[in-house]
Regions:
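Catalytic alpha/beta core domains of metabolic enzymes, predominantly
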Residues: 6-10, 16-96
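Flexible C-terminal active-site loop/helix
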Residues: 73-125
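Short, small-residue-biased leader/transition segments that mark boundaries at the very start
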Residues: 1-2
Length: 125
């Protein structure tokens, strides 16, 4: 584990695999200064404040040369569903939050092996 306050060391090492910023990035304001340290950014709607900021953050991150990962916290499919808009253009997707719950909402995201599919329209009520 590397604490976000100590991630400056990443700028000095060669990385044969992509290193993704997670705790070091929360919104567009936190993107600056991370390009030399990370190859990708993990966008979580819970941390960005919602879909609008997450979409803007993805656009800005791509413009800066970052690869995009879409992640999540533990939550129901209702919380995950908006992230599917980002997932379609992300290189890495980790939307497994509903799988960690004892019971998810009806008509939520559908999982088949390593694939995740959008929810039924009835999820929205």
């Amino acid at each position: 584990m590397l604490f976000r306050s100590r991630d400056e060391a990443l700028a000095r090492i060669r990385r044969p695999v992509a290193v993704c910023a997670d705790e070091s990035v929360h919104d567009r304001a936190t993107l600056s200064g991370l390009r030399e340290r990370y190859d990708a950014v993990n966008i979580k709607l819970d941390k960005t404040g919602g879909l609008t900021e997450a979409l803007a953050m993805a656009d800005e991150a791509r413009a800066l040369g970052f690869e995009i990962m879409v992640g999540c916290m533990v939550a129901t499919s209702l919380a995950m569903a908006p992230a599917m808009l980002l997932a379609s253009e992300a290189r890495f997707v980790d939307l497994d939050g509903p799988l960690l719950l004892k019971r998810d909402r009806e008509d939520g995201l559908r999982y088949d092996g390593s694939l995740v599919y959008p929810p039924e329209a009835s999820l929205w009520g």
